[in-house]
């Protein structure tokens, strides 16, 4: 009986998570553009309130990026560890 695991799928999933984290920058910039378009709400683009909102938004996106990227790395590492363990166990049974 042969059991086949698709460790490449796990690695690809981790890579996808990391790619999605990377694409957050485009979303961040689009939101900043919308905020600046509606900057009158905060008293103008140069106002402390508007700039404070943009700064906080940037911090939030940075945290999300870092967490998503780290999670993707962990998924890839787990897939790699499983593949190595499977290979070691499989070769010991041969």
Curated annotation (Swiss-Prot):
Report the principal subcellular site.
secreted
Known InterPro entries for this protein? ESAT-6-like_Myco, ESAT-6-like_sf, T7SS_ESAT-6-like
Protein origin, superkingdom: Bacteria
The entry's keywords: Secreted, Virulence
Q: What subcellular locations does the record give?
A: Secreted
The record's annotation in SUPFAM superfamilies points to: EsxAB dimer-like (SSF140453)
Instruction: Indicate whether Secreted appears among the record's keywords.
Output: yes
Which GO CC terms are listed, alphabetically?
Answer: extracellular region; peptidoglycan-based cell wall
Q: Does the keyword Ribonucleoprotein apply?
A: no
What does the subunit section of this Swiss-Prot or TrEMBL entry state?
Forms a tight 1:1 complex with EsxW. The complex is destabilized at low pH. Unfolding of the proteins is required for dissociation of the complex and membrane binding.
What family name appears in the similarity comment?
Belongs to the WXG100 family. ESAT-6 subfamily.
Q: What does this protein do?
A: Probable virulence factor. In mice, elicits increased levels of IFN-gamma, IL-12 and IgG(2a), indicating a dominant Th1 host immune response.
Q: What else is known?
A: Potent T-cell antigen that could be a subunit vaccine candidate.
- Which protein, by its recorded name, is this? ESAT-6-like protein EsxV
